[in-house]
Amino acid sequence: MIVFIYIVLVFLILRFSVTVFNFLSNPKLGHYGKKFDDKVSIIISPSSVDATELIQSISCQDYKNVEVLMVGSNEELSTTAANAKGRYLLFVDSCSVIKMGLLNSLIYRAKVFNLKLVVLIPNRSLNSFQDYLLEPIPDFVLLNLLPLRLVRLLNLPWSAAAWERHVFYDAESYKRRNADSEEGEKDEKKAETLLANGMILSNKRTSVNEASKQLLSTFDRNPLTIAVYLLFLIAGPLVLILNSQLAFISLPFGLIFLTRIMISFLTKQNPLINVILHPLQMVALTGLLISGTLKKLFTSGIHSKS
């Protein structure tokens, strides 16, 4: 048992270290003063939310050399992108709003660091209790596990499927990616993942099913990885509480408290609410991952039998 407790503490300290690294390195899209005139094609993914507010925010941009393409309800995203004429492609969800300076900042970042792909993590509009319960969870998991700055610095390939609603591509790179070419695989390493820093606001109301799918994508839908993560995330602290003295328990609680504060400031969320709701969010995280994994395994079993 003592070995398991030490492993749990090491896992907790490693996650805390990643959060501290993200907090100090501040992986946000900066507001740059440079101006560009390269054509940008903004491709709007369909959803249940009307895109009027998004289109209005695009028209208010200081960047005018843009074309706006709407993906049809029965149309593939790649089909719409193939008709785009821009040098850069910005994929956004229809329930989003973009702020002034976004396009110039993205192009500056892509040119200076020779990036072919920029994954953006939007700020979230939280209104209902369900929003406060579910929406912060993906941000917590990502910023607690992945040092975002190292994605570019070490050319780390990682699955960005969970964040594919807000992506900025070099157009030629996107074509090579869809062609499954060798150059397309190399372009995947010329990528960066950044917090949108208030320049993209997502108003999407995430359902339980959608939240589960996003979390599964974060772990690349690997049941073993999910099981190990939940073992140390949930079972670990419970074992500590049941088998340790109060002075020993204060360490993990202090690290969790500081972790939630730092991630809340990074994502511009309310730190007090996230700290208070942390136990409920962890219960929700466990339920979402377990239900999503079981559903995936059950569905895979049905398909394999048929």
Regions found by a protein language model. Give the residues of each.
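Long helical/loop segments within the catalytic core of UDP-sugar-dependent glycosyltransferases
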Residues: 81-83, 106-169, 173-175, 274-281, ...
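Catalytic donor/gating beta->alpha subdomain of glycosyltransferases that bind UDP-sugars
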Residues: 110, 124-128, 134, 141, ...
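Glycine-rich, basic loop-to-helix element that forms the pyrophosphate-binding segment
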Residues: 72-84, 100, 104-105
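N-terminal signal-anchor transmembrane helix
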Residues: 20-66, 77, 148-157, 289-305
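Acidic donor-binding/catalytic loop of UDP-sugar-dependent glycosyltransferases
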Residues: 93-109
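Membrane-embedded multi-pass helical conduit in multi-pass membrane proteins
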Residues: 34, 231-301
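Short aromatic/hydrophobic "clamp" motif used to bind/position activated sugar donors
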Residues: 89
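N-terminal membrane-anchoring/stem segments of glycan-assembly enzymes
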Residues: 1-34, 136, 264, 285
